[in-house]
């Protein structure tokens, strides 16, 4: 039976960057655990802001957090009150100078994580899974994606036996490294149990920049 590699990890260092960027010689495990907890807590706290991803950088003794979100106004707050409050809480907890960068996701319909969370939210509101899947796929295609696949797994419609169903439109070249494929996962907590939602969005190919030709230096042998 064929196994699937994680689309982001497969392209890591080739077309996708690391989501935690820092180096330390000692106590690596402590900083890694701090990163994991920090991302999980921020994701839960900013649930209503439509957070796509959280990246962490640690230049020196500072902490820089990059949050990609569909609704930046919720995080920033009126006159920056909410973001200042969040920054203060993080500084007190980590004992570091904290910088928070907010990056807006202009097309949430093409962000795989937000697509998966949108479907999960609809399932929690008792919307039919086929209707929720088709609606998200149609929206993504309308906004210009080259291909999209959505998969839901669990006790669909409250059935006794768990199963998986998926819906695919367009192209999805998972084994092409230069393909810009975004991947997202979310969970819908329904009265029948947890339903897992996965989304793959293909946005096109990332082509390397054309190399500039270096001018040839004339030597005695060229004359």
Curated annotation (Swiss-Prot):
Example GO molecular function: rRNA binding
InterPro entries found in the cross-reference section: KH_dom (IPR004087), KH_dom-like_a/b (IPR015946), KH_dom_type_2 (IPR004044), KH_sf_prok-type (IPR009019), Ribosomal_S3_C_sf (IPR036419), Ribosomal_uS3_bac-typ (IPR005704), Ribosomal_uS3_C (IPR001351), Ribosomal_uS3_CS (IPR018280)
GO cellular component, as recorded: cytosolic small ribosomal subunit
Domain of life: Bacteria
SMART domains found in the cross-reference section: KH
Matching CDD domains: KH-II_30S_S3
Assigned keywords, A-Z: Ribonucleoprotein, Ribosomal protein, RNA-binding, rRNA-binding
Keyword Ribonucleoprotein appears in the UniProt entry: yes
Keyword RNA-binding set for record: yes
GO biological process, one term: translation
Domain KH type-2: from-to ranges: 38-106
Gene3D superfamilies in the cross-refs: 3.30.300.20, Ribosomal protein S3, C-terminal domain
HAMAP family noted in UniProt: Ribosomal_uS3_B
Described purpose of this protein according to its UniProt entry: Binds the lower part of the 30S subunit head. Binds mRNA in the 70S ribosome, positioning it for translation.
Entry's family note: Belongs to the universal ribosomal protein uS3 family.
Quaternary structure and partners: Part of the 30S ribosomal subunit. Forms a tight complex with proteins S10 and S14.
Official protein name in the record: Small ribosomal subunit protein uS3
Organism in which the protein naturally occurs: Koribacter versatilis (strain Ellin345)
